[in-house]
Amino acid sequence: SPAKSVDLVAFFFRRIFQLIKEYGFQALIATNTIAQGKSREGGLAIIQQNGGCINFAIRSMRWPGLAAVEISQVGVHKGEWNKEYVLDNKIVERITSYLDDSEELGNPHKLHQNKDKSFQGSIVLGKGFVLEPREAQKLISQNPKNKNVLFPYLNGRDLNSNPDQSPSRWVINFFDWDEDKCKSDFPEVYLIALNKIKPQRNRLITEKIEKGVSLGVHDRRASEEWWIYLWPRPELYRTIAPLKRVLVVAQVSKTLAFTFTTKDKVLDAKLIVFANESFNKMSILQSNLHYHWAWKYCTTMKSDLCYTPRTIFETFPFPQNLYQESEFNLDQIGKTYDEYRRKLMLKIQLGFTKTYNQFHNPLLNSKIVNGEVVSRKELQNKFGKETVNLWNHLQKTEDVCSIEEATNDIKHLRQLHKEMDEAVLEAYGWHEDTEKWGPAIDLAHDFYEVDYLPENDRIRYTISPEARKEVLKRLLLLNHEIYEDE
């Protein structure tokens, strides 16, 4: 990767490496994206290919100053290194350009079988498109034809925050129609667009010009066709048209919660949409096997995972030549998990983010109240912040279940997730000893620290570090195998 194709920080890493003498050292601080995406490919990976050896690293830590960023510390030795490797203050066998200690087996390839099955939602560009539900309903009451250009608008925040994953706003959508049609067929909605969207688009263009930014094709189109989304994603809506529902996940999230939604809405750019309506695919994507693959090959935004279809989904190797029994098992556990999770969130009135905060909370305990009068600080010291948050929420919310009931329900969700992971492992054939793959993998579900998360939020209910390392190794080898066959 030429230096000009990467960011400035990766360039400095490479330039300093060029300048130091043989057997010299360099040690730098960067945001944690130095080990992700193109920054990794054009920075640390190039350094290693040219004789550099990463012998020390802190993969991710909060910047000690005021800036809300996650940083990495990276030490590089120029030349062969025969001493200890230290990763996150632990001695390891090696450190890769991903700042982990996995075997060096190369990078995953995009697979043809996953092509055109995942999409980013529509990039609207303009707050004027967005309406409150009452405003949209009023416009439809005034003119029933307006329902053809007014839709519920689902974004990542609603998906992860609302207990029923329902959209909280509506949006105008004139598709790719010409201005005359919009003006004549939907005059009330067109007038709103003219008064709100057009000035916003013009202001965005003016600001770019004032900053000396050269205008591209998309900028000119955004100005000239101001009533149309910047990226309407016709290929997305055309692909999902035959389906009854689609699978979605928030693009930026620490939970990575996949769920189904109906297609009668505009899906925002902060959603990744999968042209899939089967529970067996949902089981695989929601499993810890895919979860750790996603974290390995993602980029991050602050400390959250940013799900990119090209680097995560298109490279992910699904089980090949599934037996009918395995497909049935995946369907059944996926459906059971999805239905139980939906009922649980409605019952405790929490969205994905806060529900999974409890899912990963090792101190969750129904015996938080035992008749003693104690301070919030004492409760938090004993049961943890998340447990106290749940207890307070249930106390304040009417007609919601008790802390005992909520605790038992969340523990059952963990059990279902464990069963789903085991069904996915079996679909790959890794639940038993084989000549091709070696010994069976024991997933060993429990609460573990995961090194890719911030220091103050690393506990997850997941598979063991040993299982994670072996799963990622086999998935990468399977990716290479499928790629060669294609």
Regions found by a protein language model. Give the residues of each.
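S-adenosyl-L-methionine
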Residues: 1-69, 99-486
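Polar, glycine-rich mid-to-C-terminal structural blocks
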Residues: 75-116
